Amino acid sequence: MSSKSGLFLPLSSVITSYNENTNLSLKTIDAFLGFLVVVGGLQFGYALLVGTYPFNSFLSGFISCVGQFVITVGFRMALTQQELQSSSSKKKSPVVSPYKRAFLEFCFSSLVLHFFAVNFLG
């Protein structure tokens, strides 16, 4: 019993720290990242089991899923970096908030990604 508790103790402390120290917006982004991993895994599993007959459709769906994951990770990193900078120093606020800028970059890059994904479908 002690070996199992020794294995799960670090994991439980990481989960407790994550729940206590992470705000709701970052938890929501993390949930969306988990959703993208599940959808990408389902698409890949379907391609392995059934096949990739409309290959453009498979590539478009899978690449858009992976691309959205990468864009969302960049958005999460930008938000985390802005939180660290805002807590460490109080500078004069810029014209556009760094949070708004990160969100606009996320939206624009997501639109461009999905435009190319839909265009690739044919």
Curated annotation (Swiss-Prot):
Q: Which InterPro entries match?
A: DAD/Ost2
Where is the chain membrane-spanning? 31-51, 55-75, 102-122
Pathway given for this chain reads: Protein modification; protein glycosylation
Q: What is its main location?
A: endoplasmic reticulum
Pfam families assigned to the protein according to its UniProt record, in alphabetical order: DAD
Gene Ontology terms describing biological process: protein N-linked glycosylation
Record flagged with keyword Transmembrane = yes
| Side of membrane Lumenal, spans | 52-54
Topology within the bilayer? Multi-pass membrane protein
Query: Which keywords does this Swiss-Prot/TrEMBL entry list?
Result: Endoplasmic reticulum, Membrane, Transmembrane, Transmembrane helix
Q: Which residues lie on this side of the membrane: Cytoplasmic?
A: 1-30, 76-101
**What does the entry list under GO cellular component?**
cytosol; nucleus; oligosaccharyltransferase complex
Q: List the disulfide bonds.
A: none
Q: Does the keyword Transmembrane apply?
A: yes
Q: Where in the cell is it found?
A: Endoplasmic reticulum membrane
Job description of the protein: Subunit of the oligosaccharyl transferase (OST) complex that catalyzes the initial transfer of a defined glycan (Glc(3)Man(9)GlcNAc(2) in eukaryotes) from the lipid carrier dolichol-pyrophosphate to an asparagine residue within an Asn-X-Ser/Thr consensus motif in nascent polypeptide chains, the first step in protein N-glycosylation. N-glycosylation occurs cotranslationally and the complex associates with the Sec61 complex at the channel-forming translocon complex that mediates protein translocation across the endoplasmic reticulum (ER). All subunits are required for a maximal enzyme activity.
Q: Tell me, how does this one assemble? A: Component of the oligosaccharyltransferase (OST) complex.
Q: Which family does it belong to?
A: Belongs to the DAD/OST2 family.
- Protein name in UniProt: Probable dolichyl-diphosphooligosaccharide--protein glycosyltransferase subunit ost2
What high-level taxonomic lineage is stated for the organism? Eukaryota, Fungi, Dikarya, Ascomycota, Taphrinomycotina
